[in-house]
Amino acid sequence: MQSRLIVDAQKESLLSTHKVLRNTYFLLGLTMAFSAVVAFISMSLNLPYPNIIVLLVGFYGLLFLTNKLADRPAGILAAFAFTGFMGYTIGPILNMYVARGMEDLIMLAFAGTAIVFFACSAYVLTTKKDMSFLSSAMFALFIVLLLGMVASFFFQIPALSVAISALFVVFSTMTILYETSNIIHGGETNYIRATVNIYVSIYNLFLSLLRLLSIFSSDE
């Protein structure tokens, strides 16, 4: 009787995990598509890049709102608002690369981002390896990135820019591995939070790859 209860509990846990994972990927696909549409509109209208205050308030404000409402249906709307805002911010950046004749680099960065995301997801889903051991390294890397970004405001050093972009690629890749593992092992049970976390990682990964490609393809 006890063994049957254990088996039933395991099945229920597995079904719950699969549901969170399925909902996460579904919402991620929708928000990515919405973000791409907003980015296209932003590019078409040639909208300016937001100033630092609007950027910080928009990013952290909408991120906080999404996490606050993650347990309610309104959290889905907040997630779309957040990813839509991020799509708007990426439009002016892409226009800058298009103006410099670097459309091919945008496609390469997009392809590279897709490959990294699907490879990381496939690895975790296939091996079902627990990636929680990455948390300490991710925290340390986050501190390094924070210090590096602060330093970049005062010192315009090309090598520093390369290092920050490269570390962001590593950090984003680790985050995708960690978040996917966290879902399948029951550490994350809210698909809205999981979606936003993975979205931010993909966003940073894409921009970092694009920056690296532009640096190595130019005379900087």
Curated annotation (Swiss-Prot):
GO biological-process terms attached to the record: negative regulation of apoptotic process; regulation of proteolysis
Gene source species: Haemophilus influenzae (strain ATCC 51907 / DSM 11121 / KW20 / Rd)
A molecular function GO annotation: calcium channel activity
Protein's cellular compartments: Cell membrane
A Pfam cross-reference name: Bax1-I
A GO cellular component annotation in the UniProt record: plasma membrane
Keywords: Cell membrane, Membrane, Transmembrane, Transmembrane helix
Transmembrane region(s): 24-44, 45-65, 74-94, 105-125, 137-157, 158-178, 196-216
Protein name per the record: Uncharacterized protein HI_0044
Annotated membrane topology: Multi-pass membrane protein
Lineage: Bacteria, Pseudomonadati, Pseudomonadota, Gammaproteobacteria, Pasteurellales
Primary location class: membrane
Keyword Metal-binding attached: no
Family stated for the protein in its record: Belongs to the BI1 family.
